[in-house]
Amino acid sequence: MTTPLLGQSAEELRIWVESQGQPAYRAQQLHRWLYQRGVRSLMEITDWPKAWREQVHSVPVGRSQVVRQSAAADGTIKYLLAGADGETVETVGIPAAERLTVCVSSQVGCPMACRFCATGQSGFARNLGVHEIVDQVLTVQEGFGRRVSHVVFMGMGEPLLNLGAVVQALRVLNGDIGIGQRQITVSTVGVPGQIRRLGTYKLQITLAVSLHAPNQDLRLKLIPTAQHYPIEELLEDCRDYVETTNRRVSFEYTLLAGINDEPHHARELAAILRGFQSHVNLIPYNPIEGVEYERPGEARVRAFERELVRHKIAASVRHTRGLEEAAACGQLRRRSLSGEAQSASTRA
């Protein structure tokens, strides 16, 4: 199958256009139609000769199909997108007064199987291609009728298990769509060796590490794959990342009532992060059907935050968006084309 055009750089598009016997300026036209106008078929490119459009009409652009979308009261919109093979992912547009953020997925499902995450309970099918990642941003721009300003890789999947496609997508989002690297965040639960590998690209993105526990024993209960990546090794790799990129690391910490939200957990977390160039994002657990964890009360959440700050750790509580439409952090799922949620034992 021909590689989709979406996700290719300006130089790659020039090479393709010239390989078709066309002048280089046609690549500039193609670039504009792909990344500014969001074309879905080459037949739509009206400033190309009709004869050539007909000649290349079967070359895939790489746009996904919007199967359904649902809006929350706060303006958040969740999209269910289907790829060419029928596999689906969810992506979320999160509007604010002066910004529009897209929460993008990097895989169909997720193999990390975190106990408190809906995606982790829905099984894993495959990695997304560069075009499928970039398409999510274009879809949200089209849906909201405004430019996307921020991108967070916090949707379905573990980005560092699809690092090649993610890095190429980052370059397209930055260089071809015009989103600043510092407005892009990549979240990871941690994959041995991959944080250091990401650091070698010297990108100015924000790395967000899903920690969720202050010690290895508790983290292993919440994140089964932590058995391959001791928390001490994870933190050492994060320190290396800070030194290599001169960018601080954000640590994500989902607060689960009675599990990891006690004052002693906050003190233990402060101890392991002391001296770290970092920030802690506290995320009150967003309920998932069939999972026994509970969301702590507001007072408990604020007490945890105060304890971290008291120990000189920069911390803040993330405001939940899209909760009633299951579009909040940890709530995205693999689904069938009908919108039915998938589990690890079912296939779309």
From Swiss-Prot:
Its EC number is 2.1.1.192. Binds 1 [4Fe-4S] cluster. The cluster is coordinated with 3 cysteines and an exchangeable S-adenosyl-L-methionine. Its cofactor is [4Fe-4S] cluster. It comes from the Bacteria. Residues 96-324 form the Radical SAM core domain. SMART domains: Elp3. It is an enzyme of class 2 (transferase). GO terms for biological process: rRNA base methylation; tRNA methylation. Coiled coil: none annotated. GO terms for cellular component: cytoplasm. Keywords: 4Fe-4S, Cytoplasm, Disulfide bond, Iron, Iron-sulfur, Metal-binding, Methyltransferase, rRNA processing, S-adenosyl-L-methionine, Transferase, tRNA processing. This is Probable dual-specificity RNA methyltransferase RlmN. The lineage of its organism: Bacteria, Bacillati, Cyanobacteriota, Cyanophyceae, Gloeobacterales.
